[in-house]
Design a protein with these regions (language model features):
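C-terminal ends and interior cores of transmembrane alpha-helices
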Residues: 89-104
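Glycine-rich segments within core transmembrane alpha-helices of 12-TM secondary carriers
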Residues: 144-163
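Intracellular juxtamembrane helix-capping segments at the cytosolic ends
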Residues: 122-135
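Helix-to-loop junctions at the C-terminal end of transmembrane segments
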Residues: 67-80, 166
């Protein structure tokens, strides 16, 4: 427990902007596996076709590459903080849009995947730039090490917790609603 306290005190010694960026990225790391699980499950539930999931992923990667390239031009006009925030907001808008579509076809999935990729592209490219601005040579390894550690832990732990929760709630009634993972 003493080591955790030392680590926390060291974290508190860092620049406020760096701490804020780390906390924001850690919260995003908690949400990211949920989003990825939800989107894949949502597409499979509505299409029953793994090809559609692969197509969505392909569109997402095209969106990441495209916005990573466009981001350089946008930085001439908008602040890095604005583009970083846009990346986070567009991911939520993309998921909401995908959920409101009545039928998921190639065009709808392509557009939703591209928007989710655009959100990721804006988030990651600007996150790296913010990390560069808010760290120095002495704190950069600490920043990326702590962030990588947290992303690794959440990428493994969150899906395990979600799976355990789903398996435990299956077949139970909560507030008059029967949870059955085998029915839609």
């Amino acid at each position: 427990m003493n080591k955790l306290k030392k680590e926390y005190l060291f974290f508190k010694q860092q620049e406020p902007n760096m701490r804020t960026l780390l906390v924001t990225n850690m919260l995003y790391a908690l949400v990211l596996p949920i989003v990825e699980i939800f989107v894949g499950a949502y597409i499979m539930r509505n299409t029953s076709d793994p090809v559609m999931v692969a197509f969505y992923q392909l569109a997402m990667y095209i969106g990441i590459i495209t916005t990573s390239l466009v981001n350089g031009y946008l930085l001439k006009k908008y602040s890095v903080k604005t583009l970083y925030s846009v990346g986070i907001l567009v991911s939520g808008i993309s998921m909401f849009g995908m959920m409101t579509i009545k039928s998921l076809g190639f065009i709808e999935l392509g557009l939703a995947g591209f928007l989710m990729g655009a959100a990721s592209g804006f988030f990651w490219t600007n996150r790296y730039l913010l990390a560069l601005y808010n760290t120095n040579d002495n704190s950069r390894n600490y920043f990326f090490g702590l962030e990588s550690f947290f992303f690794s832990i959440t990428s493994i732990g969150v899906p395990l917790i979600i799976g355990a929760f789903i398996s435990q709630i299956d077949g139970k009634e909560v507030f008059g609603f029967l949870f059955n993972i085998n029915t839609s």
